[in-house]
Amino acid sequence: MARQQAPPWVHIALILFLLSLGGAIEIPMDPSIQNELTQPPTITKQSVKDHIVDPRDNILIECEAKGNPAPSFHWTRNSRFFNIAKDPRVSMRRRSGTLVIDFRSGGRPEEYEGEYQCFARNKFGTALSNRIRLQVSKSPLWPKENLDPVVVQEGAPLTLQCNPPPGLPSPVIFWMSSSMEPITQDKRVSQGHNGDLYFSNVMLQDMQTDYSCNARFHFTHTIQQKNPFTLKVLTTRGVAERTPSFMYPQGTSSSQMVLRGMDLLLECIASGVPTPDIAWYKKGGDLPSNKAKFENFNKALRITNVSEEDSGEYFCLASNKMGSIRHTISVRVKAAPYWLDEPKNLILAPGEDGRLVCRANGNPKPTVQWMVNGEPLQSAPPNPNREVAGDTIIFRDTQISSRAVYQCNTSNEHGYLLANAFVSVLDVPPRMLSARNQLIRVILYNRTRLDCPFFGSPIPTLRWFKNGQGSNLDGGNYHVYENGSLEIKMIRKEDQGIYTCVATNILGKAENQVRLEVKDPTRIYRMPEDQVAKRGTTVQLECRVKHDPSLKLTVSWLKDDEPLYIGNRMKKEDDSLTIFGVAERDQGSYTCMASTELDQDLAKAYLTVLADQATPTNRLAALPKGRPDRPRDLELTDLAERSVRLTWIPGDDNNSPITDYVVQFEEDQFQPGVWHDHSRFPGSVNSAVLHLSPYVNYQFRVIAVNEVGSSHPSLPSERYRTSGAPPESNPSDVKGEGTRKNNMEITWTPMNATSAFGPNLRYIVKWRRRETRETWNNVTVWGSRYVVGQTPVYVPYEIRVQAENDFGKGPEPDTIIGYSGEDLPSAPRRFRVRQPNLETINLEWDHPEHPNGILIGYILRYVPFNGTKLGKQMVENFSPNQTKFSVQRADPVSRYRFSLSARTQVGSGEAATEESPAPPNEATPTAAPPTLPPTTVGTTGLVSSTDATALAATSEATTVPIIPTVVPTTVATTIATTTTTTAATTTTTTTESPPTTTAGTKIHETAPDEQSIWNVTVLPNSKWANITWKHNFRPGTDFVVEYIDSNHTKKTVPVKAQAQPIQLTDLFPGMTYTLRVYSRDNEGISSTVITFMTSTAYTNNQADIATQGWFIGLMCAIALLVLILLIVCFIKRSRGGKYPVREKKDVPLGPEDPKEEDGSFDYSDEDNKPLQGSQTSLDGTIKQQESDDSLVDYGEGGEGQFNEDGSFIGQYTVKKDKEETEGNESSEATSPVNAIYSLA
């Protein structure tokens, strides 16, 4: 019956259990501990598995072991007990298991060949050695043979076989001549891995020597030579060239197996004329460049330390100019067992749990066999505290009786591995392993470690105390390692004292004491300076030192980094070095080295000796000046929580004294790689105390400055991280502003690295409505903004933003007032229209009841009307404080409709509408026409009445508070027409067809009470725009026009007083711009921001059609034709002739009259400028616009433009406006075409 496989969760549970088992105890190497503790045996030395010996020497088979008590040894041979006492040649060394087989009294070593295994035993278990295979080295003689000369054709391949006698180990093969000269080898003649000598092609010169194969045997150190070969080469007139063919291996493919970890050697030897070249490749990949190398003139490929990924197909390519051939070698990589997890000795306390793991891999996969004390585990006595789970043995609740030695044997067909691991159960009270009452002396602000090695079973718990106090030292400035060492990160004066370490387990406790003394650092506070001296003078180099008085100070001098010999001309004192009678050989660098037994400090200076007495003694005046060299050898000392001392060695000042040192720092958390200035120090110092911020990983560098300039920065110092602390400040620039009507965005400037003070800097954002008793809302944010949603429209909020890190919160933050988002305001209240006389209309209003934000002004739109006729719509823009306005009536018989709305940043709100009273001379009052939709700004600046209505219904349009400059475009038609006025930013649309359309509109305006800018007007073209505005500033005031294109490029144009209108040039066709005008003296007084768009650029080849030569010629030809027709007409009438009349009133032109359907030949030219959006056709003519209607369209109801009697009107007119008649009266137009039909 097949065994049922366990579910996956069982394996997972087993793995988790194994991971939960406690770690084993490690026995220290202390000899006293090793001698006192009982321990099962452990094999410490043994012979190799394949042990080959020299038959001329005694045989030695090693086996050594340790244990307490000392183990005894015995051997097996070929799996049977080997009785050493019965063989007089075999002995065992004392206190060792090493076997010695002595052949001095005779005997054959071959009789002792076999498989040996050593057993080491004491009362706690038995350990086993590997199975050692003993073999005796052999070097057999070469069989005697007579070799005939080898006859070969010139150019043919040849193989000389060696066939050495089998030896143990295999001999080393090499070829020589009978005169003991080595055979020269190259890519044509070479020796194969099997020892044979291969000739890719034989040449006549190969007969000049003979060839002898030699075998060298390693153990016997002997060389045996085979009888030599002699060659006889048959010559021909010409050696035929041949394509390559393989001499070794044969055929096109072969296979090879190699073991993991061994070297793979692939070989290809080819024949051919000329000699082929060999190249190597791997199918599906590249050769491993790090462990592949070519040998034997590229005929062999060696891959060292083979692994599984080296398996695959390799092929060698042999080629010459006649062709190429390929041989494929399939490589399979197998593996003898190798360790993944070798079992280790396990030392436990009574009652503890543990495990032994024996995990190995191989190809094929090896099997695992457990043994205990040299016997299979299956035949060993049962142990309820032991459980075997494949490659793991689990021990639970171990006792003293559980001690034993376990063997793990893992094997496959290619080899085996054997490992011993003992299980020892100890109950040992804590013991201290170091000397008692040690004295440790350290330098102030340095880092130090106090050691307290201990041992015990179970593993003791270690605690540290200072000066007998009860608090345990761990955390903050202290850190306790698992081995018992106490690290003090930065020594201070108050850390001096007696430290006690206490180790405790269930069997007792042990303690030891360490006395710590803190010493002041050694510092050179007055360093020697660079000097220039004349030959023969006296020089003194100062070196004053401050050190701890309890330490012995030694001051020594170096010259050019070598110890200085103090001769008769020198005097060395405690704080100086004096040189009398300076000579040229005294020039060089002098180093003062002040040292104690704990630390040292160095200072260096350079002495320059001037040989010429006339040379100035001032080196700086005699040599050119330059920037100083960079400082070097930066050192951090006096490490404190909020400060550190930085010391550096100045560089050469290059003949200009150093005036300043700039210390910079870099931190690697917020802005890695960015250097910031920290502080500045005078050039006379080379050491400074730097005040630091908490929790910054500092790195410093120093820059020297003289009158010439700054040096290159020094190399960075080592990093120093300060300890953390709660923030001492909060973020700045806290604001609360709405981005939508129902939210408020809280923003602030984030804190930098030097103000974070700790890890995980974050911000606690609080808010609540102002002047309410609501509880604070709060949220933690890691960025620099937070959006509060679902807020009422434009209400004040109290806002607080507080910094926090892992060490705590910052100070209580200030309360900032912010506002939620604005919305469209309600309509102005009490909008009143009064008419004191016929010339003036007064308007008054009150502020909106719900402004829903900050009012930025009012927009008034009004339009005169008389009956069903509408005038031009006017637009006025007012400041937010203005509540009155007067309109001067241009037409005393018209009424006015007014629409007033307030504005916030969001836009214009609901409008209040009123009408002026009816004038007294209005005979028949008529109902006012429907209210026109507000004028809105589109992207093109042109909005029809239909478009404006749709736009007002679907979106909140931005109304531009300016008076437009208009360019009219009139569509001529006899039906109810629409006049569309094209403006830069506004459009007025009416349903009435006035007789004419004016090119501008005059607006009656009233200036605001305070200083302001209003009525900004923009008239754009494709590449320029004219700007005008109104203001009430004093005369001579300067302004600035600021405009921004759609690419966010901002430009400004200063405007001198009374310089209007202003033209903006270099604009881009078809681009949208925003514009405002503000006072140059007070930027806070600005106009409303408006938007306009330039028109599309015209093509370069566009020209006025009326100036084209072909058009003038055509007109002249038509005029001449008309004149001729008129003459013919008058002649025929004078003769009484008749001409047919074609009725045109109700019948359109037929197909036999195609030219009448081409439209009229009328030409409209308004100021020689094409309409916006028109383009020139390819042939230079103007494309027919939508106003160029057919002849039928010029009549009402499809009537033609002839009199009813069909008479011809001999006139030719050019239209200037497309609407020349009103009502339904038909117009009569004449053309040459009419004249042609009148003659028919």
Curated annotation (Swiss-Prot):
TM annotation in the entry? 1111-1131
A GO-annotated cellular component: septate junction
Ranges of compositional bias, category Low complexity: 907-916
What is the residue range of the signal peptide feature? 1-24
List Phosphoserine occurrences by residue: S485, S1160, S1174, S1187, S1190, S1226, S1227, S1231
Regions of compositional bias (Polar residues) in chain numbering: 1171-1184
- Matching InterPro entries: FN3_dom (IPR003961), FN3_sf (IPR036116), Ig-like_dom (IPR007110), Ig-like_dom_sf (IPR036179), Ig-like_fold (IPR013783), Ig_I-set (IPR013098), Ig_sub (IPR003599), Ig_sub2 (IPR003598)
Where is it located?
Cell membrane
Q: Which cysteines in this chain are paired by disulphide bridges?
A: C63-C118, C162-C213, C268-C316, C358-C408, C452-C501, C543-C592
Q: Where is the composition biased (Acidic residues)?
A: 1154-1165
Cited SUPFAM superfamilies: Fibronectin type III, Immunoglobulin
What would be an example GO MF term here? protein binding involved in heterotypic cell-cell adhesion
Cytoplasmic compartment spans: 1132-1240
Q: Where is the composition biased (Pro residues)?
A: 917-933
Could you tell me the membrane topology recorded for this protein?
A: Single-pass type I membrane protein
Domain of life of the native organism: Eukaryota
Q: Where is this region: Disordered?
A: 710-740, 902-942, 1141-1240
**How does the record describe its quaternary structure?**
Horseshoe-shaped homodimer. Probable constituent of a NFASC/NRCAM/ankyrin-G complex. Associates with the sodium channel beta-1 (SCN1B) and beta-3 (SCN3B) subunits. Interacts with GLDN/gliomedin. Interacts with MYOC.
Describe the family membership recorded for this protein in Swiss-Prot or TrEMBL: Belongs to the immunoglobulin superfamily. L1/neurofascin/NgCAM family.
The Swiss-Prot or TrEMBL note on domains reads: Homophilic adhesion is primarily mediated by the interaction of the second Ig-like domains.
Q: What is this protein called?
A: Neurofascin
